[in-house]
């Protein structure tokens, strides 16, 4: 679907980041509100790779059809703006939810529920040849029904080799999902490591992503490919807001290589959120899909114990801990939660060759005893979420509160705006917050 900016009325700003601004939008042509990500091309002078990253994210989104992954609803492009729409999620994210809990930790049962859905989403990405590289609680969003959706794919990368595991857990089409631009708590802001270019990748989607039938989705994908240009892919990426570039001595030239012996393609770029970065990425020895399973291990640890396992006083110390500090659990956690702690230990194996999920992919992770009893084929059908978000405010927007997203950017650049504005009529008003996405 093409986004008509003449009809799209922004209700509020959901987030701001290195790639642009996210708006909650009501559109008379659609019954549901959606999130509109808008990249201002005029900012490319200070963020030269943000445009390519934005187009890469659109390319990935256009190929997703899974209950725990967002889909591209549509996009539009003007001389100054590139905008794309995704379903809106009103339930916040796992980081917000954890901080709302009395002890700021999840129960093993809640961890099992949420992480099973995350594993399902990661499995789908890996089956499509995409390594995510940005898993963290802030990027695990809650739909209105309490199920989760991953977000932010600008740091993802296409690898040449697919994992051997089967695809994701649910073959059913995605239910009406919601999207919400995530934001960070000021007291728990995490920094992303800026991307380093993989200069040799062509970046084209794998063949199995293509469909012979010219469906509406395929037509949308063709348009995205046209926007991406002949090379596709994300190429080199600019750093995220408040991120500092880190270049370990062992860094190798950016490239994709097949490491032989049945191994998957490797990337030598250096991206992610520092507390979630895998050791092979810090060492610069090349990484593949296994970095996502390491991140799942960090996620489980943070959900269970309220902190990531290797966080240091600064980035240098954090990376040193990732490489060398022994994994520890508080108190008698190993006795009380043997399956949970064993899952974490196997996911946080510093040797990516023996890490859980590396050899057998998602099937190996799903077979771990911690997930015993999980109905993988029916996650959204038979599992009741531990937390159901309260209904979103559906109050009417009063005259003058809805606005044209183009006016937002005209004002930023000191340009005159039209004197007459249409107003929205079917969404709530709320104060803005800032974030990186």
Report residues per predicted region.
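Conserved N-lobe beta3->alphaC-helix segment of eukaryotic protein kinase catalytic domains
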Residues: 38-64
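Protein kinase glycine-rich loop
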Residues: 10-18, 22
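Glycine-rich ATP phosphate-binding loop
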Residues: 19-43
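Activation segment signature within eukaryotic-like protein kinase domains
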Residues: 114-115
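C-terminal regulatory tails of eukaryotic serine/threonine kinases
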Residues: 167-250, 358-437
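A short, aromatic-enriched beta-strand patch in the conserved N-lobe beta-sheet
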Residues: 74-75
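A conserved loop-to-beta-strand element in the N-lobe of protein kinase catalytic cores
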Residues: 70, 79-87, 91, 95-96
């Amino acid at each position: 679907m093409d986004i008509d900016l003449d009809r799209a009325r922004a209700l509020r700003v959901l987030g701001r980041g290195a790639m642009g601004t996210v708006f909650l939008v009501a559109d008379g042509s659609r019954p549901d509100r959606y999130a509109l990500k808008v990249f201002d091309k005029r900012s490319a002078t200070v963020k030269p790779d943000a445009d390519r990253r934005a187009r890469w994210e659109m390319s990935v989104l256009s190929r997703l059809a899974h209950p725990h992954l967002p889909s591209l609803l549509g996009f539009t492009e003007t001389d100054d703006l590139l905008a794309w729409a995704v379903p809106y999620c009103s339930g916040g994210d796992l980081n917000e939810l954890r901080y709302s809990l009395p002890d700021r930790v999840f129960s093993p049962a809640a961890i099992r529920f949420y992480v099973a859905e995350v594993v399902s989403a990661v499995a789908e990405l890996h089956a499509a040849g995409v390594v995510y590289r940005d898993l963290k609680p802030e990027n695990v969003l809650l739909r209105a029904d309490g199920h989760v959706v991953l977000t932010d794919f600008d740091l993802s990368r296409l690898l040449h080799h697919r994992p051997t595991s089967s695809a994701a857990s649910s073959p059913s089409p995605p239910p009406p999902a919601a999207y919400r631009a995530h934001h960070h708590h000021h007291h728990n802001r995490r920094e992303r490591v800026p991307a380093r270019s993989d200069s040799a990748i062509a970046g084209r989607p794998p063949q199995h992503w293509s469909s012979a039938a010219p469906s509406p989705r395929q037509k949308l994908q063709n348009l995205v490919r046209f926007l991406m240009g002949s090379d596709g892919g994300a190429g080199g990426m600019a750093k995220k807001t408040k991120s500092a570039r880190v270049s370990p001595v062992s860094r190798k030239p950016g490239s994709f290589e097949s490491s032989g012996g049945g191994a998957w393609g490797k990337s030598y770029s250096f991206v992610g959120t520092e507390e979630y970065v895998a050791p092979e990425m810090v060492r610069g020895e090349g990484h593949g899909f296994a970095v996502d399973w390491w991140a799942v291990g960090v996620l489980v640890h943070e959900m269970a114990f309220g902190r990531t396992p290797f966080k240091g006083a600064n980035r240098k110390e954090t990376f040193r801990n990732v490489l060398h500090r022994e994994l520890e659990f508080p108190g008698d956690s190993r006795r009380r939660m043997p399956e949970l702690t064993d899952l974490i230990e196997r996911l946080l194996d510093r040797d990516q060759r023996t890490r859980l999920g590396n050899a057998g992919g998602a099937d190996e992770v799903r077979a771990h005893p911690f997930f015993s009893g999980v109905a993988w084929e029916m996650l959204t059908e038979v599992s009741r979420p531990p937390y159901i978000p309260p209904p979103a405010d559906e109050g009417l927007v009063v005259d003058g509160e809805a606005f044209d997203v183009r006016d937002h950017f005209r004002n930023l650049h000191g340009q005159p705006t039209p004197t007459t504005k249409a107003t929205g009529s079917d969404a709530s008003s709320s104060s803005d917050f800032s974030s990186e996405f």
